[in-house]
Amino acid sequence: MALSNIERHYNKHPEDKRLLRRHGIVEFETTMFYIHKYLKPNDYILDVGAGTGRYTSALTAEGFKVKAVELVQRNIDVFLKRDPDADVVKGDARDMYMIPDNVADVTILLGPLYHLIGDEEKVKSLLEAKRVTKPGGLIF
C-alpha cells in the first residue's frame, strides 16, 4: 500500500518532540486545559491521530482509559517504545472500522482536522468521530 502524504510527512519530520518545544508546550497545555474542563471521572477517551501518544499517555497517567488510533507506523513504534502498555491501533480517522459505534465518552480529533486536506476529508473524519462517540459525548 502506498504511503499517504501524512505518513510521508511524519516519516520525514518526527512528531515525538514537537509538543515538548516552546510552541508545542503552549499547544499541549491549552488543549489539556479545555479537555479537563469537560472530562468526567471514568470517561473512556478515544485519541484519534494520537501521534506519539503525548495526550494519550498524559490522560492515562491521570487514570482515564484511553485508546489511541494512529495512521503513521513510525509514530506508533515511538509511542510503544516509550509506553509498551499503551492501547494503540493503526488506523485512519476517515475510516475507523476497528472501533465499534458509540464507545467513547470523549473523542480527541485534533491532528486529523488540521492535517487532512479538503472539506470532504475533514467531514469524513468528523462523521467517523460522531459514529464512535456515545450520544451526548464530546468531540474535540
Predicted regions and their residues:
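Class I SAM-dependent methyltransferase SAM/SAH-binding core
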Residues: 54-95
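A short acidic, Gly/Pro-enriched loop at the edge of an enzyme's catalytic core
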Residues: 97-107
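A short glycine-rich, Lys/Arg-flanked "PGG" loop and its adjoining helix->strand segment in the class I
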Residues: 123-135
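A short SAM/SAH-binding and catalytic strip from SAM-dependent methyltransferases
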Residues: 106-120
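Conserved beta-strand signature within the Rossmann-like core of class I S-adenosyl-L-methionine
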Residues: 136-140
